């Protein structure tokens, strides 16, 4: 609100990073950057970021991009943090897998009511994740366990890292 719509460009980063110490980060997976269209600088920003090798993509609908990022980050994030489990352990447990799928279904239902569509983000197949979450557990669970467990490069979800580091604020 302080900047107003003219001062903000919606965006998302799908790269995976690790914080080694204050001011010291390492890029674990270079996926890309999403920028919402609609701002006078959006096209130029995408071009500059892409020229810098950041695999930038323009998204015509900011809501689709932002909710798709939420959907991509949802699996095994809060559950892993609360229960101090890895994402693979969460998805290996039948009851927790069911809980995760119910959370995904709820997010997809909210998106549908608002006319928001899942969309793939840079090197992040969100539409496939949305599709897989609707498959029977015997088909989807082994695939999602591997994808969610390995999709973070062996790193725990950010919420888990923040919670167990005693941080009072999280992304």
Task: Set out the residue ranges of the language-model regions.
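Charge-dense, low-complexity intrinsically disordered segments
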Residues: 36, 90, 94, 98, ...
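Generic recognition of short, well-ordered alpha-helical interface segments
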Residues: 40, 44, 69, 98-106, ...
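NAD(P)-dependent Rossmann-like dehydrogenase/reductase catalytic/cofactor-binding core
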Residues: 50, 101, 105-171
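Active-site/ligand-binding neighborhood in enzyme catalytic cores
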Residues: 68, 72-87, 140-155
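A short alpha-helix capping/helix-coil boundary motif
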Residues: 23-27, 37, 57, 85-88, ...
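Rossmann-fold dinucleotide-binding core
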Residues: 1-69, 74-75, 80, 84
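Active-site segments that bind and position negatively charged phosphate/pyrophosphate groups
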Residues: 61-66, 83-107, 113, 117, ...
């Amino acid at each position: 609100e302080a900047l107003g719509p003219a001062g903000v460009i919606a965006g998302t980063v799908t790269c995976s990073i690790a914080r080694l110490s204050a001011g010291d980060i390492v890029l674990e997976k270079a996926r890309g950057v999403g920028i919402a269209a609609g701002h006078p600088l959006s096209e130029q920003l995408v071009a500059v970021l892409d020229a810098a090798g950041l695999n930038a993509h323009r998204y015509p609908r900011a809501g689709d991009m932002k909710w798709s990022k939420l959907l991509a980050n949802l699996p095994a994030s809060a559950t892993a943090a609360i229960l101090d489990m890895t994402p693979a352990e969460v998805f290996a447990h039948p009851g927790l897998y069911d809980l995760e799928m119910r959370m995904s279904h709820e997010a997809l239902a909210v998106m549908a009511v608002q006319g928001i569509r899942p969309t793939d983000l840079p090197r992040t197949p969100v539409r496939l994740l949305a599709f897989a979450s609707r498959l029977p557990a015997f088909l989807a669970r082994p695939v999602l366990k591997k994808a969610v467990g390995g999709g973070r490069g062996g790193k725990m979800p950010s919420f888990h890292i923040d919670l167990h580091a005693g941080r009072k604020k999280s992304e």
